Structures are given as C-alpha cells and as structure tokens.
C-alpha cells in the first residue's frame, strides 16, 4: 500500500527531527540547516550530506560524497530502506558519516 501524502510528510518530518536530534546531541562541530523540507548537515571538514523529500515518489533522498541514495518507507519494519541496496537509512548513515567525516555516530531507530 502506498503512503498517503500526509503520512509521507509526517514520516519525513519525524525522520528529519530525529536526525537533527542525533547530530545536536553529539556535541560535534556540525552545522545543520533546514529549509523547505531539505536538511543539510555540514561537517567541520567542509563535506556535507543532504536529505530531501521527493513527494511525487514518496521517497527520502540522501546526497553524499559517495553518491545519491533513494529510500522507500517499509511499513512492516517501520524503517526507510534504500531502493537499490535494501540497506536501512540508519545503517547507511553510520557508514557514510564515518567515511565522509571520520565521525562515529549511531543512528538507532532509523
């Protein structure tokens, strides 16, 4: 069953808030910018990751140095899953943040 527009926005809003909380609570030198449904995370080494919502596709997109990734929400596991690798958003973020910014963070629940 496809996500309704309202449910999709609620899920993305909640996910972006969780991400902001994780980065804020890390006490690391990270800049967060949120505007028009796009969350940009800037690390002190100048690299960044960008999260954006793709409403027509009901997907959450992640842009990083290693590429662009598209996530569909899986109602059964209640997780965002990469549409290519089937990797959970949280697992991929742990790997990307470590590779890109040499920071070890846990994204539990994502």
Swiss-Prot record:
Involved in iron-sulfur (Fe-S) cluster assembly. May act as a regulator of Fe-S biogenesis. This is Iron-sulfur cluster assembly protein CyaY. Belongs to the frataxin family. SUPFAM superfamilies: Frataxin/Nqo15-like. The lineage of its organism: Bacteria, Pseudomonadati, Pseudomonadota, Gammaproteobacteria, Pseudomonadales. One of its GO terms (molecular function) is ferrous iron binding. It holds the Pfam family Frataxin_Cyay. GO terms for biological process: iron-sulfur cluster assembly. It comes from Pseudomonas fluorescens (strain ATCC BAA-477 / NRRL B-23932 / Pf-5). Keywords: Iron, Metal-binding. Disulfide bonds: none annotated. NCBIfam families: FeS_CyaY (TIGR03421). GO terms for cellular component: cytosol.
């Amino acid at each position: 069953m496809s996500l309704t527009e309202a449910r999709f926005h609620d899920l993305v809003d909640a996910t972006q808030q969780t991400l902001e909380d994780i980065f804020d609570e890390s006490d690391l030198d990270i800049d967060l910018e949120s505007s028009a449904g796009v969350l940009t995370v800037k690390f002190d080494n100048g690299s960044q990751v960008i999260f954006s919502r793709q409403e027509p596709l009901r997907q959450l997109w992640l842009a990083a140095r290693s590429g662009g990734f598209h996530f569909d929400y899986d109602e059964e596991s209640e997780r965002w899953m990469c549409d290519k690798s089937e990797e959970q958003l949280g697992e991929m973020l742990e790997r990307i943040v470590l590779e890109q910014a040499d920071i070890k963070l846990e994204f539990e629940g994502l």
